[in-house]
Amino acid sequence: MPRRKKKIKEASESQNLEKKDLETSSCVSIKKKRRLEDLLIVISDSDGEETKEENGLQKTKTKQSNRSKCLAKRKVAHMSEEEQFALALKMSEQEAREVNNQEEKEEELLRKAIAESLNSCWSSAASATRSRPLAAELSSHSHQENTKDSGTTEGVWQLVPPSLCKGSHVSQGNEAEQRKEPWDHNENTEEEPVSGSSGSWDQSSQPVFENENVKCFDRCTGHLAEHTQCGKPQESTGSGYAFSKAVQGRGDTSRQCLPIPADTKGLQDTGGTVHYYWGIPFCPAGVDPNQYTNVILCQLEVYQKSLKMAQRQLVKKRGFGEPVLPRPPFLIQNECGQEDQTSDKNEGISEDMGDEAKEERQESRASVWHSETKDFQKSPIKSLKQKLLLEEEPTTSRGQSSQGLFVEETSEEGLKSSEGDNSVPTTQSIAALTSKRSLVLMPESSAEEITVCPETQLSFLEPLDLNREDSPDSRELPIEVRMAVGDKQVANREDCMKENPPPAVSSSTRVSCPLCNQDFPPTKIEQHAMYCNGLMEQETVLTRRRREAKNKSDGRTAAQPALDANRKEKCYLCKSLVPLGEYQCHVEACLQLAKVDREDGIEGTRRPRVCAPVEGKQQQRLKKSKDKGHSQGRLLSLLEQSEHRTTGVEKKPKYSEVRTFRMPSPEVEEASCSREMQSTLSQLNLNESPIKSFVPVSEATNCLVDFKEQFAFRSRTKSGRGRRRKS
């Protein structure tokens, strides 16, 4: 059994080797056929005698090759595995040697051709005389090489005998004489298949190499070019000759080497031939190829330099502009100190007086921030400010709304001491504090400076207590009594202004916010605009601060007085800016007047109106005389009631028209309370409050989101997915 298996294995391996040999032999036969087809064509004018002889030689060669192949196949079939392996190794070594020899020959020929092309151009006569002995020598050399390789390679090719070459020379010479075409001065040697290793190539006929090298002489330049094999001759025409096909290297790619025909008329005029040198495009006759190549290189160098210069001109760097440096801190403080004067230039005398009071309070507040600790024990106002600043801190990061309405905690002793002092000593202490402002606000201590702007600070002397409830007695008092009390308060304030006149400050650089119509300095407008939501922002700030004030005032009997009432708030009824301390009184007066006008329904109610700031002063004076225990304010409730009652009121006039509601001075109060101003109250639109703009989710009709059905829809989809997964 084991012997039979070995025999079977040997038989299978022998079959595989036979198949491989058949494939290799078929490839070799195909190559040989291609070589036969790609033989060098020799042009002659004979009647075809040479072609018949060549065809006979080719047939005999093919028959011999086929016989040798059959014998080799039979031998391989009878060989053992070891013999087949040894034969395969020998064949591979022979092929490698042939390839190496061929590559070396090609390199040598290339070197020689390049050297000769660079030296000089041979004349056609000299090339004709040298062609015949070179052909004889190279043909004998090729015969010797073929005899050496006959034992190792299959299908040895024989070259064309010299008799054919001679015949072709004679026939070509005769034909050239008849045609009289000026291709070369030497008419006897137009086409000669010569093999040589030296000579210059032109672009018209470049050499192509093959295993068996057959070389022909190029008629145009007189140089030598290498070709593969001789083929069928073709009859020559008047335009060109010598179609020479070759196969380059091992790639088996054919190429035609065609001579470029020159212009016959130009040649006749000049009397010479135009030579094209190897490697140089269109080098004219009589010019050194080396010099011509140098000219081309110089042109390329100039072009490259000009291109670089053009690119450098296109790319230009832009210079950096001047740096944007921040302003020094003392300029910012001057702007903050001057921001209130120019904004109120064109307003009345009462507004100017209010601005002066605001500037006084602002200076006193700014001086408290930077005063020393020794001064806090001397003055009760200083100690009160220190306590307030230590206790109170902003609760949010907003630049404008975080410093809204808030109430500070202070002790009852500070409250009593501040109430016990008259207005004159208070102003004197404020003036003493403001005298130190120039020493405190120095640019050296810019890291510790805090710029104070009136729109972002609260009134410490006259705080707005939103949670306190108005007593019924104060609401029942007639407006005439309030007017009388307000006159006294205004007189006291005028005396204070005369004693301590504040410095003149300009506010020409103030910028108004387009959303909330409030004026801010340039240093604060950007920070405010980032978080400003219009009128809704003020309402949210009021409600939030009202909760904080309610929590802080639970354990206190009365609200403390603040140090300043510098901030202005906008009244939603008359659309006018009111000082923060007088805001609540002003709103209540506006509501009462609107209610009276609505109930009467007559525009001619001749009840004299009180100016907004005067009404605020009267109400504040009356409320200070009452008990401090009423801490529940009713501003929001009154606003809501007035909105629900007046749903059909017409839209109010523009802000510029309603602005006449503010009076120039307290001396001209009667003129402000005219019929025209009362008629504007009847046209007030109370529906513009931010509270009314809020719409609950249940009443939203234009919303794209269905708040009621969204949760049910999600539950259905989840249950459906679960069922699908279970199934």
Curated annotation (Swiss-Prot):
Region (AIR): 270-400
UniProt PTM comment: Sumoylated. Phosphorylated upon DNA damage by ATM or ATR.
Chain intervals for the UniProt region annotation (Disordered): 1-23, 45-70, 133-206, 326-427, 607-654
MF terms (GO), sorted A to Z: DNA binding; histone binding; K63-linked polyubiquitin modification-dependent protein binding; nuclear retinoid X receptor binding; zinc ion binding
PTM annotation (Phosphoserine): residues: 29, 44, 46, 140, 205, 379, 402, 474, 637, 665, 689
Main localization of the protein described in the UniProt heading: nucleus
Domain UIM: 80-99, 104-124
UniProt entry keywords in alphabetical sequence: Chromatin regulator, DNA damage, DNA repair, Isopeptide bond, Metal-binding, Nucleus, Phosphoprotein, Repeat, Transcription, Transcription regulation, Ubl conjugation, Zinc, Zinc-finger
Region of interest called Zinc-finger-like region, as start-end residue ranges on this chain: 513-590
Zinc finger UBZ4-type: from-to: 510-537
Region (Necessary for interaction with NR6A1 C-terminus): 400-508
PROSITE patterns: UIM, ZF_UBZ4
Keyword field contains Phosphoprotein: yes
Localization per record: Nucleus
InterPro entries with a match to the protein in the record: Rad18_UBZ4, RAP80, RAP80_UIM, UIM_dom
Alphabetical list of Pfam families matching this protein: RAP80_UIM
One CC-aspect GO term: BRCA1-A complex
GO biological process entries: chromatin organization; double-strand break repair; mitotic G2 DNA damage checkpoint signaling; mitotic G2/M transition checkpoint; negative regulation of DNA-templated transcription; positive regulation of DNA repair; regulation of DNA repair; response to ionizing radiation
Assembly behavior: Component of the ARISC complex, at least composed of UIMC1/RAP80, ABRAXAS1, BRCC3/BRCC36, BABAM2 and BABAM1/NBA1. Component of the BRCA1-A complex, at least composed of the BRCA1, BARD1, UIMC1/RAP80, ABRAXAS1, BRCC3/BRCC36, BABAM2 and BABAM1/NBA1. In the BRCA1-A complex, interacts directly with ABRAXAS1. Interacts with ESR1. Interacts with UBE2I. Interacts with NR6A1. Interacts with TSP57. Interacts with TRAIP.
Record remark: domains: The tandem UIM domains form a continuous 60 Angstrom-long alpha-helix and mediate binding to 'Lys-63'-linked ubiquitins. UIM1 and UIM2 bind to the proximal and distal ubiquitin moieties and recognize an 'Ile-44'-centered hydrophobic patch. Since UIMs don't interact with the 'Lys-63' isopeptide bond the UIM-linker region between the 2 UIM domains determines the selectivity for 'Lys-63'-linkage, and its length is very important for specificity. The Abraxas-interacting region (AIR) mediates the interaction with ABRAXAS1.
Family, as annotated: Belongs to the RAP80 family.
Its biological purpose: Ubiquitin-binding protein. Specifically recognizes and binds 'Lys-63'-linked ubiquitin. Plays a central role in the BRCA1-A complex by specifically binding 'Lys-63'-linked ubiquitinated histones H2A and H2AX at DNA lesions sites, leading to target the BRCA1-BARD1 heterodimer to sites of DNA damage at double-strand breaks (DSBs). The BRCA1-A complex also possesses deubiquitinase activity that specifically removes 'Lys-63'-linked ubiquitin on histones H2A and H2AX. Also weakly binds monoubiquitin but with much less affinity than 'Lys-63'-linked ubiquitin.
Name of the protein in its database record: BRCA1-A complex subunit RAP80
Organism annotation: Mus musculus (Mouse)
